[in-house]
Amino acid sequence: MITGFFGVPGCGKTTLATFFAQRELKRIKLFQSKFKRVYTNFSCSGCYRFDFRQLGVLDFSDALVIIDEITIDADNRAFKSFKQESVDFFIYHRHYNCDVLYFTQQWDAVDKKIRNLTQALYRIKKSYLFPFVTAKAIFRTCDINEYTSELVVGYRFPNFWEVFLALFHNKKVGKLRYCVFAPRLWKFFDSYSRPFTWAKWSPQIWS
């Protein structure tokens, strides 16, 4: 299953990604997980490190793959640089007992092929009750334009009946909301890590 999460900078995306990683690591240790490893492309205690370019090339079987800031490697405008090997990984991930969670600041900036394969989507927001991070499910709709007869994709939040069924853990509805206590996760990752090293320079002051 491929699940997408999006939210503005500083809303808690990496915190929530760490929550899923640490939760799965605990399940693996207790032999309660279908996975054997957890891979992340950001520094996260106990997880295996990987590079996006390795997807579809190296074996990621029986694993939970968590990708932070996916648009760095799979931007919708840079579709020509999106390799076929990576496409194959997302298409056949279930064949290898692999689930993918990805996080981004802009949902519509993610490569279209990945968006089309995304089965669940969540919007991340900072809770008014700091320091909690919340994520709310968003459902995609598909209608036919009566004038052009073309498919029109839209989005909506869960309706009353879906919220009601979720109370009984209905599998078809799925999880509608996540709420995590951020401080207990901060020790597992560095929110201010710098993935790039830029050249130093001396800016000039306007006269």
Region spans (language model):
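Hydrophobic anchor at the beta1->P-loop junction of P-loop NTPases
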Residues: 5
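Conserved P-loop NTPase motor module
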Residues: 120, 135-207
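Walker B catalytic acidic pair
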Residues: 68-70
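Loop/turn-to-beta-strand initiation segments
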Residues: 35, 61-64, 96-102
